[in-house]
């Protein structure tokens, strides 16, 4: 495990998620303060907007307007040039669970994952889907049968979508067709057998690596937040562990590469992902460290 220094970028939050490097600044959301935030060059943290029904994945349209997932009402919101938040897409018809992470392609098409079941309510596991949201806000399901689709990235050439399956012991990849639909699912990395178990606890216990958020680098490797092992892991195709960064005693739930040279790895960390505990405390942070290979792809 790499012995790297971790630097605190932002602190005093409930549950930080969705870090993105955009326009030379770090953006992230905080679940239970319902905030989208940006870290300014002087280190100050600015609240950009409030998402009443809990923010998650972030992205930007080609014209610069920001998209943000509104989890609990299963919508994608758009921030207009005057700062107003408006509905971009209602994907509730496609979702059994909360809407979650998102990646936006260069042409403005957005891919949004959903839980598949009521995780926080203690429901049994059911597979989830990936929803394609067009730039005009229309939407359709483009992939199913995924075990809690979570962090997603698009390759630098725009031809491959990578999807972390949190409870699936794997990272999946799909060829992106010219119209934005997806080809058949393939393994990018597999960490063991796919659990066939309704209990979330047993599924999580069976995961060698539990991939939450992800970010791509210029060598074609993927950094993932391994949310059960308090570490970020750099993986090659097939699942070979190339590098790792410990965040113990905190768990890490999302990662992003950025900084002036693309070699800063940002890590969203918190003691756990328990909604009751996290919403009642301000123990979440964003940390950073330096890695060797710079960012590539989207986000």
Label the model's feature ranges.
Residues 1-12, 41-43, 185-189, 198, ...:
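A short helix->beta-strand "capping" segment at the edge of beta-propeller domains
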Residues 46-50, 86-90, 140-144, 182-192, ...:
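Beta-propeller fold detector
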Residues 10-25, 51-70, 75, 93-110, ...:
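Beta-rich, blade/repeat-based domains predominating
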Residues 174-181, 291-296:
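Short loop/turn segments immediately following beta-strands, especially the blade-tip
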């Amino acid at each position: 495990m790499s012995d790297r220094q971790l630097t605190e970028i932002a602190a005093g939050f409930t549950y930080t998620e969705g870090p993105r490097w955009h326009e030379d600044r770090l953006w992230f959301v905080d679940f239970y303060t319902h905030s989208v935030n940006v870290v300014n060059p002087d280190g100050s943290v600015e609240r950009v907007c409030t998402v009443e029904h809990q923010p998650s994945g972030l992205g930007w349209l080609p014209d610069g307007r920001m998209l943000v997932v509104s989890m609990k009402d299963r919508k994608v919101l758009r921030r207009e040039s005057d700062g107003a938040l408006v509905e971009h897409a209602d994907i509730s018809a496609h979702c059994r669970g909360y809407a979650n992470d998102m990646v936006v392609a260069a042409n403005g098409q957005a891919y949004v994952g959903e839980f598949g079941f009521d995780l926080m309510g203690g429901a049994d596991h059911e597979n989830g889907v990936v929803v394609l949201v067009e730039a005009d806000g229309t939407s359709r399901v483009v992939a199913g049968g995924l075990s809690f689709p979570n962090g997603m990235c698009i390759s630098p050439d725009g031809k491959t979508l990578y999807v972390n399956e949190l409870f699936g012991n794997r990272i999946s990849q799909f060829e992106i067709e010219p119209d934005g639909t997806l080809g058949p699912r393939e393994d990018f990395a597999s960490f063991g057998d796919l659990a066939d178990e309704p209990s979330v606890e047993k599924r999580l216990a069976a995961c060698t690596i539990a991939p939450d958020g992800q970010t791509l680098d210029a060598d074609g490797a993927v950094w993932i937040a391994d949310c059960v092992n308090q570490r970020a892991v750099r993986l090659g195709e097939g699942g070979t562990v190339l590098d790792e960064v410990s965040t113990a005693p905190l768990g890490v739930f999302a990662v992003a590469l950025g900084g002036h040279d693309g070699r800063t790895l940002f890590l969203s960390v918190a003691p756990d992902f328990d909604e009751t505990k996290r919403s009642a405390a301000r123990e979440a942070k964003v940390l950073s460290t330096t890695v060797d290979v710079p960012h590539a792809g989207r986000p």
